[in-house]
């Protein structure tokens, strides 16, 4: 079935209402410009959608609220995107990752406790 892929720009603010508005605008755009494109949903894969994020992120944070807009499909064991986006670089030892932001501190503690980040796949109904 046809889908519309959602690209999540790095560093974009993930305020829930702004995200809802963006999705509504995308629906209107596709209905107006591509009326014959019978897509079934908006689809994305990202570290932001990983279900395990709830194990270390602050409840109610923008990332978890953003992920809640999606119906989860599955998680994938690919930590590289998380590490790159949160820490900026790959370190050989977990102890060497920076802990300057709340997210960095929380993810580092999660890693040191044996947690494994990943990617999530999800969709938003048309």
Q: What kind of region is each of these model predictions?
A:
Residues 1, 123-126:
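GNAT-family acyltransferases
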Residues 2-80:
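Acyl-donor binding region in acyl/amide transferases
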Residues 20, 25-27, 32, 58, ...:
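Arginine residue identity/basic-tract feature
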Residues 65-124:
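Accessory, usually C-terminal, subdomains that scaffold auxiliary metal cofactors
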């Amino acid at each position: 079935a046809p889908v519309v892929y959602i690209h999540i720009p790095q560093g974009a603010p993930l305020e829930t209402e702004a995200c809802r508005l963006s999705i509504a605008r995308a629906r209107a755009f596709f209905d107006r410009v591509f009326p014959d494109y019978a897509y079934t949903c908006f689809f994305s894969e990202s570290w932001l959608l990983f279900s395990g994020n709830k194990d270390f992120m602050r409840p109610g944070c923008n990332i978890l609220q953003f992920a809640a807009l999606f119906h989860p499909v599955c998680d994938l064991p690919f930590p590289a995107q998380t590490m790159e986006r949160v820490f900026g670089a790959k370190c050989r030892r977990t102890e060497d990752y920076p802990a300057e932001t709340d997210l960095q501190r929380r993810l580092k503690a999660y890693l040191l406790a044996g947690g494994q980040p990943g990617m999530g796949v999800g969709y938003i109904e048309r």
